């Protein structure tokens, strides 16, 4: 397969067929069918697995087989099908080779006619994909239980189903990648600031990367300060959460092939929120969120405060606890600082092994790691006592 240029389509059907054979002739899933309608030679091209032969037969070939009144040449046939027929064609005819390749790769069936420099793309997409399931990384007790999938238009339809207003807008764009991956910018025109939307479009259009596999690829290009440790965007796999963010005036970015939606702009406090906070009472939800903040502060500053207190300010520790800590440190071959780093490193190794290993052994790895760490802690406790 070679690279398609932006040259216009030829008038001769044989020339366009030769171009398609040059591009996709070596692919076993590429399918073409030549036929004649009202004396006009035509050709249908599609990819098996991306387009449905059943849809093509029912909607296109059956209608074309009935004959096209008054059409004796290719340009008249294309014009009639594009403007007067009820077939599901794209709004704009294909005029260049690049558009032809992108339409075929997008799962459409393309009709080429002799003597016409335009082609028609029919919406016969039938791409296999994962069905809607429960979100794996955002569990909740109440509320919707559906999650995004890898199909871009299905994800947009999930948002459209919950956001039933005319101000909801989903703009599908093509990334500047070799694979020409599609992404969607979803927002509410009545709530999202127009200047923010325009700035975001310009930044995303200027992204130059070889491949776009996930919405997280855009994160580094949206950050103004590269040294800022706080995330520039939030992520969710729940359509309900994405819809709630759109109602707040934020912008949601969906990428074809990714079940993860990016929400911009994002605040650090929003990473502690979940759907259950809004389905519970205000007092209970506030206490749970406060607990999350305390847990975060403890996880971030707890090890450092412990090392600081043991190494540099032992007078801050109660005497009876300090004596037990001293006994434990006497039997430990490492000082407090390297000891804490070693424990943190071991925890990260166990977590990474449990996350990346195959599912058949990941639970075993996590269980063995927990048993080893627990046994070490119990043994250390016994030695102190």
Residue ranges and their predicted role:
Residues 331, 355-358, 373:
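Short alpha-helical transmembrane interface motifs in multi-pass membrane proteins
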Residues 384:
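Conserved small/polar residues in nucleotide/adenosyl-binding loops
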Residues 291, 352-362, 378-380:
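Membrane-helix interface "capping/anchor" motifs
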Residues 160, 243, 347, 374-375:
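Short glycine-/small-residue-rich flexible loop motifs, especially phosphate/cofactor-binding loops
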Residues 282-352:
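Core alpha-helical transmembrane segments of integral membrane proteins
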Residues 1-301, 315, 319:
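Membrane-embedded alpha-helical signal segments
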Residues 293-300, 364-376:
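Small-residue-enriched core segments of transmembrane alpha-helices in multipass membrane transport
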Residues 339, 349, 372-373, 378:
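Membrane-helix boundary elements
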């Amino acid at each position: 397969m070679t690279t398609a240029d932006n040259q216009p389509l030829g008038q001769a059907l044989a020339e366009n067929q030769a171009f398609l054979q040059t591009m996709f002739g070596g692919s076993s899933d590429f399918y073409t069918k030549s036929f004649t309608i009202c004396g006009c030679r035509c050709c249908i091209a599609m990819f098996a697995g991306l387009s449905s032969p059943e849809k093509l037969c029912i909607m296109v070939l059956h209608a074309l087989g009935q004959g096209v009144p008054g059409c004796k040449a290719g340009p008249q046939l294309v014009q009639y099908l594009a403007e007067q027929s009820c077939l599901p064609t794209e709004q704009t005819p294909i005029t260049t080779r690049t558009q032809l390749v992108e339409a075929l790769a997008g799962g459409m069936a393309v009709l080429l006619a002799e003597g016409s420099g335009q082609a028609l793309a029919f919406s016969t997409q039938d791409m296999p994909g994962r069905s809607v399931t429960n979100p794996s990384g955002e569990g909740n007790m109440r509320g919707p239980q559906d999650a995004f999938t890898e199909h871009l238009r299905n994800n947009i339809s999930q948002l459209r189903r919950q956001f039933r207003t005319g101000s909801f807008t989903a703009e599908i764009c093509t990334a500047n990648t070799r694979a020409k991956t599609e992404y969607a910018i979803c927002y509410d025109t009545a709530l999202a600031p127009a200047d923010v939307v325009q700035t975001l479009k310009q930044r995303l259009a200027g992204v130059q990367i070889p491949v776009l596999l996930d919405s997280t690829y855009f994160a580094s290009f949206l950050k103004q300060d590269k040294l800022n440790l706080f995330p520039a965007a939030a992520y969710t796999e729940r359509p309900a959460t994405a819809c709630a963010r759109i109602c707040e005036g934020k912008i949601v970015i969906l990428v074809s092939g990714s079940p993860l939606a990016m929400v911009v702009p994002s605040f650090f406090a929003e990473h502690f929120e979940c759907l259950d906070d809004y389905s519970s009472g205000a007092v209970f939800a506030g206490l749970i969120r406060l607990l999350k903040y305390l847990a975060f502060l403890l996880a971030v500053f707890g090890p450092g405060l412990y090392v600081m207190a043991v190494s540099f300010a032992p007078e801050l520790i109660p005497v009876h606890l300090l004596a037990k800590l001293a006994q434990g440190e006497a039997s430990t071959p490492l000082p407090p600082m390297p000891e804490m780093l070693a424990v943190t490193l071991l925890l990260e190794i166990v977590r990474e092994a449990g996350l990346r290993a195959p599912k058949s052994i990941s639970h075993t790895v996590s269980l063995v790691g927990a048993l080893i760490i627990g046994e070490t802690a119990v043994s250390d406790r016994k030695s102190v006592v």
